[in-house]
Curated annotation (Swiss-Prot):
One Pfam family recorded for the sequence: zf-CXXC
Protein name: CXXC-type zinc finger protein 5
PANTHER family referenced in this protein's UniProt entry, alphabetically: CXXC-TYPE ZINC FINGER PROTEIN 5, ZINC FINGER-CONTAINING
Superkingdom: Eukaryota
InterPro entries per UniProt: CXXC4/CXXC5, Znf_CXXC
Chief localisation class: nucleus
Description of its domains: The CXXC zinc finger mediates binding to CpG-DNA.
One Gene Ontology cellular component annotation held by this UniProt entry: nucleoplasm
Entry's Gene Ontology molecular function annotations: DNA-binding transcription factor binding; methyl-CpG binding; sequence-specific DNA binding; zinc ion binding
Residues engaged in binding Zn(2+) 2: 270, 273, 276, 286
Subcellular location: Nucleus; Cytoplasm
Amino acid sequence: MSSLGGGSQDAGGSSSSSNTNSSSGSGQKAGGTDKSTAVAATTAPTSVADDAPPPERRNKSGIISEPLNKSLRRSRPLSHYSSFGSSGGGGSMMGVESADKAAAAAASLLANGHDLAAAMAVDKSNPTSKHKSGAVASLLSKAERATELAAEGQLTLQQFAQSTEMLKRVVQEHLPLMSEAGAGLPDMEAVAGAEALNGQSDFPYLGAFPINPGLFIMTPAGVFLAESALHMAGLAEYPMQGELASAISSGKKKRKRCGMCAPCRRRINCEQCSSCRNRKTGHQICKFRKCEELKKKPSAALEKVMLPSGAAFRWFQ
């Protein structure tokens, strides 16, 4: 009986010990589950907070203000990261400090005009400054493009100024001197010359420059500048006289004067020599044996063109 009682006691002790062990094991398991649920409870708000959509941003009028860029629509304001970092502990505070340092470095790089690679290298260490690095990159690219456009515009203006200066020099070389032109010209021709110098011509492409359109010979082969036309049109050393202009504008095809030889370019009518006496008559002044211009082109047809200033102009084709 004693052995049976001891066996029962041993069985009861083992059962009690097993019960206590099982209860303690269950208590440890329960404690482990409680800890795991607590950890999950602590990590769940952070994941929910990260996955939750950003709050709607509204201005003072209550209108929702969303960024135009699609990649920035899910971005959060800086206050979200600062509040999350302050509740997270020392590591998050270090992250906020590094974010502030990265933002300050990016601003300094933008102000000093450094390269984009340096700004991206500073921003790679912090994931929260990706949007800032993108904004810095876009601003730097826009600034570089603006400087390139400004440089191209300056180069174009310089080339235009150089071409304009060269054209002005050519015009000044072919224009008559005012002292020589005003000595023997009649009043009407002097006024016409002043209008041709100071006013604009009827040609739209030559309106900005005082170029007489009579200097250009238009032929089927092209447009040429006549050297002898400078003398005959009165734009060179020996200008034409009023009588010659009236004689040419009468419509006669007979050649009266060449404008190149000494009798033709004589300004004052002496009324003694045959050349001066025949100026106002229908006789021919230039002779083939005296005038080199008529020897070169004896059968050339005489043509007449009315200039915008009112004076007649002729040249030999």
